[in-house]
Protein backbone atom coordinates (compact mmCIF):
# COMPACT_ATOMS: atom_id res chain seq x y z
CA UNK A 1 0.00 0.00 0.00
CA UNK A 2 1.90 2.99 -1.26
CA UNK A 3 1.31 6.20 0.68
CA UNK A 4 -1.04 8.38 -1.33
CA UNK A 5 0.00 11.89 -2.21
CA UNK A 6 -2.52 14.61 -1.33
CA UNK A 7 -2.61 16.10 -4.85
CA UNK A 8 -5.42 15.06 -7.17
CA UNK A 9 -4.68 13.28 -10.42
CA UNK A 10 -5.47 16.45 -12.38
CA UNK A 11 -3.09 18.53 -10.29
CA UNK A 12 -0.42 15.86 -10.64
CA UNK A 13 -0.73 16.02 -14.43
CA UNK A 14 -0.61 19.79 -14.39
CA UNK A 15 2.59 19.76 -12.35
CA UNK A 16 4.34 16.94 -14.19
CA UNK A 17 6.05 19.13 -16.77
CA UNK A 18 7.36 21.49 -14.12
CA UNK A 19 8.62 18.63 -11.99
CA UNK A 20 10.43 17.15 -14.94
CA UNK A 21 12.17 20.47 -15.50
CA UNK A 22 13.03 20.69 -11.78
CA UNK A 23 14.61 17.25 -11.97
CA UNK A 24 16.91 18.36 -14.77
CA UNK A 25 17.73 21.69 -13.15
CA UNK A 26 20.83 22.45 -11.13
CA UNK A 27 20.45 22.02 -7.35
CA UNK A 28 18.44 24.89 -5.88
CA UNK A 29 20.42 27.23 -3.63
CA UNK A 30 20.22 26.11 -0.01
CA UNK A 31 18.76 22.72 -0.92
CA UNK A 32 20.11 19.39 0.29
CA UNK A 33 21.53 18.63 -3.16
CA UNK A 34 23.22 22.04 -3.20
CA UNK A 35 24.73 21.37 0.23
CA UNK A 36 25.99 17.96 -0.87
CA UNK A 37 27.47 19.36 -4.08
CA UNK A 38 29.31 22.14 -2.25
CA UNK A 39 30.62 19.95 0.58
CA UNK A 40 31.48 16.93 -1.56
CA UNK A 41 29.87 14.60 0.98
CA UNK A 42 26.44 13.12 1.62
CA UNK A 43 25.64 12.32 5.26
CA UNK A 44 23.23 9.43 5.81
CA UNK A 45 21.55 8.67 9.11
CA UNK A 46 21.14 5.02 10.11
CA UNK A 47 19.90 2.94 13.01
CA UNK A 48 22.16 0.68 15.05
CA UNK A 49 19.80 -2.15 15.98
CA UNK A 50 16.57 -1.91 13.96
CA UNK A 51 16.78 -5.46 12.60
CA UNK A 52 16.26 -6.10 9.70
CA UNK A 53 15.79 -2.52 8.50
CA UNK A 54 19.00 -0.73 9.49
CA UNK A 55 21.61 -2.18 11.83
CA UNK A 56 25.23 -3.26 12.27
CA UNK A 57 26.32 -6.69 11.08
CA UNK A 58 29.21 -8.60 12.66
CA UNK A 59 31.71 -6.53 10.65
CA UNK A 60 30.16 -3.29 11.99
CA UNK A 61 28.83 -2.56 8.50
CA UNK A 62 25.41 -0.92 8.27
CA UNK A 63 23.02 -3.28 6.49
CA UNK A 64 19.31 -3.97 6.17
CA UNK A 65 16.19 -3.64 4.04
CA UNK A 66 15.89 0.12 4.54
CA UNK A 67 19.64 0.55 4.19
CA UNK A 68 19.35 -0.91 0.69
CA UNK A 69 16.98 1.98 -0.09
CA UNK A 70 19.52 4.43 1.38
CA UNK A 71 22.25 2.99 -0.82
CA UNK A 72 20.05 3.31 -3.92
CA UNK A 73 19.30 6.95 -3.09
CA UNK A 74 23.01 7.69 -2.59
CA UNK A 75 23.74 6.24 -6.04
CA UNK A 76 20.97 8.41 -7.53
CA UNK A 77 22.52 11.50 -5.90
CA UNK A 78 25.94 10.63 -7.33
CA UNK A 79 24.39 10.33 -10.78
CA UNK A 80 22.35 13.53 -10.42
CA UNK A 81 25.40 15.56 -9.35
CA UNK A 82 27.76 13.73 -11.71
CA UNK A 83 29.97 12.93 -8.73
CA UNK A 84 30.75 9.18 -8.87
CA UNK A 85 33.38 9.59 -6.14
CA UNK A 86 31.09 11.49 -3.76
CA UNK A 87 32.09 10.83 -0.14
CA UNK A 88 29.45 8.99 1.89
CA UNK A 89 29.39 9.49 5.66
CA UNK A 90 27.17 7.36 7.91
CA UNK A 91 25.84 8.77 11.19
CA UNK A 92 24.12 6.57 13.83
CA UNK A 93 20.79 7.96 15.05
CA UNK A 94 18.14 6.93 17.57
CA UNK A 95 14.37 7.21 17.92
CA UNK A 96 14.92 10.15 20.25
CA UNK A 97 17.43 12.24 18.26
CA UNK A 98 16.65 11.50 14.60
CA UNK A 99 14.39 14.53 14.01
CA UNK A 100 16.55 17.13 15.84
CA UNK A 101 19.70 15.90 14.08
CA UNK A 102 17.97 16.08 10.71
CA UNK A 103 16.70 19.59 11.39
CA UNK A 104 20.08 20.95 12.47
CA UNK A 105 21.81 19.55 9.39
CA UNK A 106 23.82 16.78 11.07
CA UNK A 107 22.63 14.34 8.39
CA UNK A 108 20.86 14.73 5.04
CA UNK A 109 18.35 11.88 5.07
CA UNK A 110 17.66 8.51 6.63
CA UNK A 111 15.88 5.31 5.66
CA UNK A 112 15.29 3.18 8.74
CA UNK A 113 12.13 2.38 10.65
CA UNK A 114 10.59 5.84 10.88
CA UNK A 115 6.81 6.13 10.65
CA UNK A 116 5.43 8.84 8.39
CA UNK A 117 2.53 10.48 10.22
CA UNK A 118 0.82 13.86 10.43
CA UNK A 119 2.56 14.88 13.65
CA UNK A 120 6.03 14.19 12.27
CA UNK A 121 5.21 15.93 8.99
CA UNK A 122 5.17 19.16 11.00
CA UNK A 123 8.89 18.67 11.65
CA UNK A 124 10.23 16.77 8.64
CA UNK A 125 9.36 15.60 5.13
CA UNK A 126 9.00 12.00 4.01
CA UNK A 127 9.50 9.99 0.87
CA UNK A 128 6.85 7.68 -0.51
CA UNK A 129 6.28 4.51 1.50
CA UNK A 130 8.94 1.80 1.67
CA UNK A 131 7.23 -0.57 4.14
CA UNK A 132 3.98 -1.00 6.09
CA UNK A 133 3.79 -2.39 9.64
CA UNK A 134 1.23 -3.07 12.36
CA UNK A 135 1.82 -2.31 16.05
CA UNK A 136 1.51 -5.50 18.11
CA UNK A 137 2.98 -7.26 21.16
CA UNK A 138 5.90 -9.62 21.72
CA UNK A 139 5.41 -11.87 24.73
CA UNK A 140 6.33 -15.26 26.14
CA UNK A 141 4.73 -18.10 24.20
CA UNK A 142 1.98 -19.92 26.07
CA UNK A 143 1.58 -17.11 28.61
CA UNK A 144 -1.46 -15.11 29.65
CA UNK A 145 -0.95 -12.24 27.21
CA UNK A 146 -3.00 -12.79 24.05
CA UNK A 147 -4.11 -9.26 23.25
CA UNK A 148 -3.92 -5.69 24.52
CA UNK A 149 -6.83 -6.20 26.92
CA UNK A 150 -4.64 -8.59 28.92
CA UNK A 151 -2.19 -5.80 29.77
CA UNK A 152 -4.36 -4.30 32.52
CA UNK A 153 -2.32 -3.77 35.72
CA UNK A 154 0.80 -5.19 34.01
CA UNK A 155 4.27 -3.84 33.20
CA UNK A 156 4.77 -3.25 29.48
CA UNK A 157 7.92 -2.06 27.72
CA UNK A 158 8.11 0.14 24.63
CA UNK A 159 10.96 1.95 22.90
CA UNK A 160 11.22 5.64 23.76
CA UNK A 161 10.54 8.20 21.05
CA UNK A 162 8.39 5.90 18.91
CA UNK A 163 4.79 6.07 17.76
CA UNK A 164 4.18 2.88 19.75
CA UNK A 165 5.07 4.77 22.93
CA UNK A 166 2.45 7.40 22.09
CA UNK A 167 -0.18 4.77 21.27
CA UNK A 168 0.48 2.76 24.42
CA UNK A 169 0.22 5.79 26.69
CA UNK A 170 -2.99 6.84 24.96
CA UNK A 171 -4.48 3.35 25.35
CA UNK A 172 -3.48 3.26 29.01
CA UNK A 173 -5.12 6.61 29.71
CA UNK A 174 -8.29 6.15 27.67
CA UNK A 175 -8.99 2.57 28.80
CA UNK A 176 -7.83 3.19 32.39
CA UNK A 177 -5.70 0.05 32.24
CA UNK A 178 -3.26 0.99 35.02
CA UNK A 179 -0.30 -0.34 33.04
CA UNK A 180 3.22 0.42 34.23
CA UNK A 181 4.86 1.59 31.03
CA UNK A 182 8.64 1.23 30.78
CA UNK A 183 10.30 3.36 28.08
CA UNK A 184 13.56 1.77 26.93
CA UNK A 185 16.34 3.52 25.00
CA UNK A 186 16.27 1.20 21.96
CA UNK A 187 14.65 -1.98 20.67
CA UNK A 188 17.40 -4.22 22.03
CA UNK A 189 16.99 -2.71 25.50
CA UNK A 190 13.22 -3.17 25.23
CA UNK A 191 13.62 -6.87 24.49
CA UNK A 192 16.10 -7.33 27.33
CA UNK A 193 13.52 -5.77 29.65
CA UNK A 194 10.96 -8.30 28.43
CA UNK A 195 13.40 -11.22 28.55
CA UNK A 196 14.41 -10.43 32.14
CA UNK A 197 10.79 -10.56 33.30
CA UNK A 198 10.57 -6.86 34.15
CA UNK A 199 7.75 -6.57 31.60
CA UNK A 200 5.16 -9.06 30.36
CA UNK A 201 5.06 -7.65 26.83
CA UNK A 202 6.96 -5.45 24.40
CA UNK A 203 4.85 -3.22 22.13
CA UNK A 204 6.34 -2.19 18.79
CA UNK A 205 5.98 -2.55 15.03
CA UNK A 206 5.45 -6.21 14.14
CA UNK A 207 8.43 -6.43 11.78
CA UNK A 208 10.78 -5.02 14.44
CA UNK A 209 9.36 -7.46 16.99
CA UNK A 210 10.10 -10.28 14.56
CA UNK A 211 13.67 -9.01 14.36
CA UNK A 212 14.09 -9.01 18.14
CA UNK A 213 12.56 -12.48 18.38
CA UNK A 214 15.00 -13.77 15.76
CA UNK A 215 17.94 -12.41 17.80
CA UNK A 216 16.77 -14.07 21.03
CA UNK A 217 18.70 -16.98 22.56
CA UNK A 218 15.57 -19.12 22.15
CA UNK A 219 13.34 -17.54 19.47
CA UNK A 220 10.69 -20.24 19.82
CA UNK A 221 10.00 -19.08 23.39
CA UNK A 222 8.44 -15.85 22.10
CA UNK A 223 5.39 -15.00 20.01
CA UNK A 224 3.85 -11.92 18.42
CA UNK A 225 0.23 -11.44 19.46
CA UNK A 226 -2.60 -8.93 19.55
CA UNK A 227 -4.79 -7.09 17.09
CA UNK A 228 -2.70 -4.29 15.51
CA UNK A 229 -3.37 -0.96 17.20
CA UNK A 230 -2.36 0.87 14.03
CA UNK A 231 -1.12 0.33 10.50
CA UNK A 232 1.91 2.51 9.90
CA UNK A 233 3.88 3.47 6.82
CA UNK A 234 7.66 3.75 6.93
CA UNK A 235 9.23 6.42 4.75
CA UNK A 236 12.71 7.84 4.29
CA UNK A 237 13.00 11.14 6.16
CA UNK A 238 14.44 14.39 4.79
CA UNK A 239 14.27 18.06 5.68
CA UNK A 240 11.08 19.99 4.94
CA UNK A 241 10.61 22.27 1.93
CA UNK A 242 13.06 20.50 -0.37
CA UNK A 243 10.93 19.29 -3.33
CA UNK A 244 13.92 18.61 -5.57
CA UNK A 245 15.54 16.16 -3.16
CA UNK A 246 12.18 14.56 -2.31
CA UNK A 247 11.50 13.98 -6.00
CA UNK A 248 14.87 12.30 -6.44
CA UNK A 249 14.12 10.05 -3.48
CA UNK A 250 10.57 9.23 -4.65
CA UNK A 251 11.74 8.52 -8.20
CA UNK A 252 14.42 6.17 -6.86
CA UNK A 253 11.92 4.36 -4.63
CA UNK A 254 9.45 4.02 -7.52
CA UNK A 255 12.15 2.53 -9.74
CA UNK A 256 13.15 0.04 -7.05
CA UNK A 257 9.55 -1.02 -6.45
CA UNK A 258 8.40 -1.25 -10.08
CA UNK A 259 11.52 -3.14 -11.17
CA UNK A 260 10.94 -5.92 -8.64
CA UNK A 261 14.08 -5.05 -6.69
CA UNK A 262 12.08 -4.31 -3.52
CA UNK A 263 10.59 -7.83 -3.66
CA UNK A 264 14.10 -9.26 -3.81
CA UNK A 265 15.15 -7.12 -0.84
CA UNK A 266 12.15 -8.32 1.15
CA UNK A 267 12.96 -11.97 0.46
CA UNK A 268 16.61 -11.33 1.33
CA UNK A 269 15.95 -9.65 4.69
CA UNK A 270 12.71 -11.24 5.89
CA UNK A 271 12.65 -14.78 4.50
CA UNK A 272 16.29 -15.88 4.48
CA UNK A 273 19.13 -16.11 7.03
CA UNK A 274 20.59 -12.67 7.75
CA UNK A 275 23.69 -11.40 9.57
CA UNK A 276 25.09 -11.34 12.15
CA UNK A 277 23.82 -14.74 13.38
CA UNK A 278 22.34 -16.13 10.14
CA UNK A 279 18.87 -16.10 11.67
CA UNK A 280 15.72 -16.29 9.56
CA UNK A 281 12.88 -13.98 10.58
CA UNK A 282 10.30 -15.99 8.59
CA UNK A 283 8.17 -12.86 8.37
CA UNK A 284 5.18 -12.89 6.03
CA UNK A 285 3.28 -9.87 4.74
CA UNK A 286 -0.48 -9.60 4.45
CA UNK A 287 -1.80 -8.90 0.94
CA UNK A 288 -2.41 -5.27 1.94
CA UNK A 289 1.11 -4.77 3.24
CA UNK A 290 2.57 -6.63 0.28
CA UNK A 291 1.34 -3.82 -1.97
CA UNK A 292 3.92 -1.49 -0.38
CA UNK A 293 6.63 -3.38 -2.27
CA UNK A 294 5.06 -2.73 -5.68
Q: Which ranges hold each PLM region?
A:
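Extended ligand-binding regions for polar small-molecule ligands
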Residues: 23-27, 71-76, 149, 154-155, ...
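Ligand-binding clefts/hinges and TM-proximal coupling segments of bilobed small-molecule sensing domains
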Residues: 23-27, 163-182, 220-222, 253-294
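Extracytoplasmic small-molecule ligand-binding "clamshell" domains
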Residues: 24-109
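Bilobed "Venus flytrap"/periplasmic-binding protein-like clamshell domains
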Residues: 43, 49-52, 62-79, 115, ...
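Beta->alpha turn/N-cap motifs
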Residues: 46-50, 91-96, 105-117, 141, ...
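Periplasmic-binding protein-like
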Residues: 48, 131-139, 206, 214-253, ...
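Acidic, polar ligand-binding/catalytic clefts
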Residues: 71, 75, 83-150, 290-292
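A ligand-binding cleft/hinge motif common to bilobed small-molecule-binding domains
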Residues: 97, 111-122, 167-174, 195-230
Amino acid sequence: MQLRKPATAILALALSAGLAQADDAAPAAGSTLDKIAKNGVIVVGHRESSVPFSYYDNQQKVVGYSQDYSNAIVEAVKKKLNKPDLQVKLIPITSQNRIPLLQNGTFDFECGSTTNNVERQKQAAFSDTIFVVGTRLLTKKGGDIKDFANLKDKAVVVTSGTTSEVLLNKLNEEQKMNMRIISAKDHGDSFRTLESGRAVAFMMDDALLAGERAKAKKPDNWEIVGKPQSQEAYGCMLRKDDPQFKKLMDDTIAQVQTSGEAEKWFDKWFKNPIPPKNLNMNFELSDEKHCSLN
